[in-house]
Regions:
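Catalytic cores of enzymes
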Residues: 1-194
Length: 194
C-alpha cells in the first residue's frame, strides 16, 4: 500500500486527514483503504537524514521510559517490549531500581536506536520550549532535548498526551514534542494529537 506524507498548514494542521472518507449507512470508504497516512511538520523534515548511515553501524539499543504507577497500561507496554527485545539491548527507566530522572534520560537519548515513552506529556502553549514529558523528578522539556548533540535514532515513539498537538492560535508553528524529536535527529517519530 502506498504511503502518503501529509504536510498540513494553517488550520488543516488540526484535522485528522487520515480519517477522511465517506461514512454513510450504505458503505464505508475512507483514505485508509487506499494509502497509509503519515504526517510531517515541514517539507524539509522529509529530506534524507545525514546521519542515517552512521546510526545503522552501531549496536541496536532501545530505551523505554514508563510511568507504571500513574499509567497501569504502561506496564503492559513494557512487558510486550521485553518479550521482543533482548535484555542486553534494552534500557528501562521508571521502574523500581531505575528512576526516570531528566538528566539520565536526556543523556541516554543519543545512545538509543529507538525510544519509547509511555508517560504523561504536556504542552505549554505560551512557552513551547517548556513542553515535555513528565518523568520521576520533573519535566523532560523540549529545551533540554535540544541540548543533546547527536540524536540519530531511527524511531521515537511517544505514547503520551499532547506530544503532537499544535496551538490553534499559531497553526503554522511546528513546535511540539514530536516535531522537536524529529528536528533533533530522530528519523521517525510517532506522537499523539490528543
Amino acid at each position: 500500500m502506498p504511503i502518503l506524507q501529509w504536510c498540513p498548514t494553517g488550520h488543516f494542521t488540526f484535522l485528522p486527514i487520515h480519517a477522511a472518507g465517506n461514512y454513510d449507512d450504505q458503505a464505508v470508504e475512507c483514505a485508509a483503504d487506499y494509502f497509509i497516512s503519515s504526517y510531517t511538520p515541514t517539507v524539509g523534515a522529509l529530506l534524507a537524514h545525514p546521519l542515517a548511515a552512521a546510526s545503522s553501524s552501531r549496536a541496536f539499543k532501545m530505551m523505554v521510559v514508563v510511568q507504571t504507577k500513574e499509567l497501569p497500561s504502561a506496564k503492559t507496554e513494557l512487558e510486550k517490549i521485553q518479550r521482543h527485545i533482548p535484555s542486553d539491548a534494552l534500557v528501562v527507566f521508571g521502574v523500581p531500581g531505575a528512576v526516570a530522572n531528566v538528566e539520565t534520560v536526556a543523556s541516554c537519548l543519543s545512545e538509543a536506536s529507538i525510544v519509547h515513552f509511555a508517560c504523561h506529556g504536556t504542552q505549554d502553549r505560551l512557552k513551547p520550549l517548556n513542553s515535555g514529558l513528565k518523568l520521576d523528578d520533573g519535566l523532560l522539556r523540549i529545551s533540554r532535548i535540544m541540548k543533546e548533540k547527536t540524536l540519530d535514532g531511527s524511531l521515537a515513539f511517544c505514547c503520551a498526551c499532547e506530544t503532537a498537538m499544535g496551538d490553534e492560535k499559531l497553526p503554522d508553528e511546528a513546535m511540539s514534542l514530536g516535531a522537536s524529536l524529529l528536528f533533533s535527529g530522530f528519523q521517525s517519530v510517532i506522537a499523539t494529537m490528543w
